[in-house]
Amino acid sequence: MASCQKLISRVAKNSSASCKHQATSGKPQARHNSQVYIKPERIIMKTSEALKLVGGLSKPSKMPGWAYGLPAKECKTGSRLVKVKGSTCEGCYALKGCYVFKVVQEAQYRRLKSIKHELWTGAMALLINSKKSKWFRWHDSGDVQDEAHLMKIFAVCRLTPETKHWLPTREAWVKHFISMAPANLVIRFSAPMVDQAAPASWPTTSTVVTTGRTCPAPDQDNACGDCRACWDPKVRNVAYGQH
C-alpha cells in the first residue's frame, strides 16, 4: 500500500504539470527563459517542459534506473494474449494493483497521446539524460504501438548514448527492424506462452517458466540488485519465474 501511495503521489505531480502544458500547448511562444527552440539538427527546451510534454517517467522499485509506461490495455498483441489461458499476459500485473487507479490510468493515456507530438523524441532524450542513469527500461507497462513509435524510440536511444536501454516486446513485427536498432538498445522478444521455448530467430529474448528461471529477483527482495542481464546483449535469454 505504501508503494501505491508513493506511485499515486508521483503520478499526480506529473499529471498536474502535464495538464498545464497541454492547456498552453500549440505553437511555441517566446517566454523568458522557457522558450523552445527548434532547429533542423536539434531541439532545446527546459527539463521541466520536457517532463510536461512526455507526461513523466516511472521509477519501479525493482529496477536500477528509470522506466516509461503506457496503458497495458492498448498493447496490440498483449490485449489479445491477456484473454488466453496459459499465456504470459494472463493475469498481467499492469492491469491490477496500483495500475488501475484513475490517476495512473489518466497519466498513462496522456503519455500515449504525447508520442505523436513533434517534440516527443527530443523531450524524452532530454529527460532521460537529465536523470544521469545508466539503465532505462521501456514499457514497464504497455508496448510498442507501431513502426513510427519504434523509430522514435531508436532516435531517443541514439540521443542518450550514456544510457543502456532495454525494450521488452511481444510485437513480432519488431524483428524486421532489429538491424536498425542502436548499439545501446537491447530488444527482447517475450515468448507469448508460459514454458514456451525462446524463438531462435531473435537474438535476445525472454521467457516465463514454471521451473528453471534465471532471473534472480525473487531471491533478492524482488529487485534486480546487481543483475543487469536484461540489458546485456550477450545474454541470449532471460527466464522469469511464473508469478
For the regions a protein language model found, what residue spans apply to each?
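Class I S-adenosyl-L-methionine
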Residues: 2-15, 19-20, 37-243
